[in-house]
């Protein structure tokens, strides 16, 4: 009989609310020694959030701040703005926008998921194909049942190796 997601998944899953701040999220990353969490609201999976989502948000905010600062630059001036003059302003703009951001603002809203009955080969295929490190296991009604990480699959391989 083929190994299924149910055989490999962890059922004790730490989740986060979509409404917590990114500051609180970072504390949870550190405290739990992980880089991502399923996002759950009313017992249903609504997304997944990882550190790379936060980095993406920072880069987006920086690009936006640079665009706005270029737009408002005095085009009649012959003086080139120096990076030292604009960097603190950009940092302040990015910081204030990120300070009010929540998990909902950065999470992946349509995460790749599998069902508990899916073969583990499908789970591995999704991790590789989508270049992700974790996949939530969900019931047909959207409830989170567990999670499988790439390390869980590596552990499965190690356990199968002859002594």
What are these regions (language model features)?
Residues 1-163:
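Tandem CBS (Cystathionine beta-synthase) repeat/Bateman regulatory domains
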